[in-house]
Regions:
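An N-terminal assembly and electron-transfer interface module characteristic of large anaerobic redox
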Residues: 1-300
Length: 300
């Protein structure tokens, strides 16, 4: 039973199927619909579509209220309807819970108001990186990015170091394992690796494992110390306080700049609109900081 809306939901499902012929459709019941007791499954059964329809009943007040709880509900429902195996869902749920913990302890969800900050001057930070490479300093770039936003943060790695110092290749560490995650996530890793203009020295894990691949990257740098390192994507998941050397973070959140400085990063650069710029893409997209590095190479 859906109070006055069951027929509308059935018609919407039929229209969506007729228009797009999808293999899967997701139906999410939100606060108002769940409070009054709507039965999503009945409407789905009545629509009788030739595809798998996954209902997710989500509303405010559920569980602890973390923004990852809804994603966990989707994973559980996907298992129930045979979309993904239980083992894969459990792995992703573990990552989501670790991501929540990182945000609460090291990121934006620490419980206090954080003033937006657009970070350090991109030109000055780019010059610092280029000077270090020219001066034969050991430099590392760590890509610890989240899913599709990796298309933007990978652009920061996409410069030709030989134009700066052909004898000083930076170390590249990245969470671009193409064998981890669902096919869409694995394909992101494949696409980026094909477009990168440099070899990757160490792969820390998959693109949905950013809550734990930061530590893996740090462990690698402990064994291969550098003078300067740049962490792109989710830099607050990287234990900067444990790694010596000059540190630069590149983040997509103006409200992450202050927490990253508090963690110990010497410089923080903010890339704006990472999610909107990478929505639906399958290619590396231009980043302001990546563009600045490439431009500054020719400056003396």
């Amino acid at each position: 039973f859906i109070l006055g809306a069951s027929e509308k939901l059935e018609n919407t499902l039929k229209e969506a199927y007729d228009m797009f012929k999808p293999e899967f459709i997701g139906v999410v019941g939100t606060c108002a619909s769940m409070i009054i007791g709507e039965d999503l499954k009945e409407a789905i059964a009545n629509a009788n579509l030739d595809c798998t329809v996954i209902p997710v009943e989500s509303h405010g007040g559920f569980g602890e209220g973390d923004n990852t709880e809804g994603a966990i509900m989707v994973l559980d429902s996907a298992v129930e309807y045979g979309i993904i195996p239980r083992e894969e869902a459990d792995r992703q749920i573990e990552m989501l819970k670790k991501a929540t913990e990182i945000e609460k302890t090291r990121g934006m969800a620490q419980g206090k108001y954080i003033q937006p900050n657009f970070g350090d001057n991109k030109e000055e930070v780019a010059k610092k990186i280029i000077k270090a490479l020219r001066d034969n300093k050991k430099v590392a770039f760590v890509l610890n990015a989240k899913k599709e936003t990796s298309y933007l943060f990978a652009d920061i790695l996409n410069f030709d170091y030989r134009e700066i110092n052909p004898e000083n290749k930076p170390i590249i560490v990245a969470n671009l394992d193409e064998n981890i995650g669902l096919s869409r996530i694995r394909n992101h890793a494949v696409n980026i690796k094909q477009e990168l203009k440099t070899d990757i020295d160490y792969i820390t894990g998959g693109l949905d494992e950013y809550p734990v691949t930061g530590k893996a990257a740090a462990d690698y740098l402990k064994e291969n110390p550098v003078d300067l390192y740049v962490v792109c994507g989710v830099p607050h998941a990287f234990p900067v306080e444990e790694i010596e050397g000059e540190s630069i973070a590149v983040t997509d959140g103006p409200r992450l700049v202050e927490p990253l400085k508090d963690l110990g990063y010497d410089n923080v650069v903010a890339e704006l609109d990472a999610h909107s710029k990478t929505l639906g893409t399958d290619k590396i997209v231009f980043s302001d900081f990546g563009g600045m590095i490439r431009s500054a190479i020719d400056w003396k």
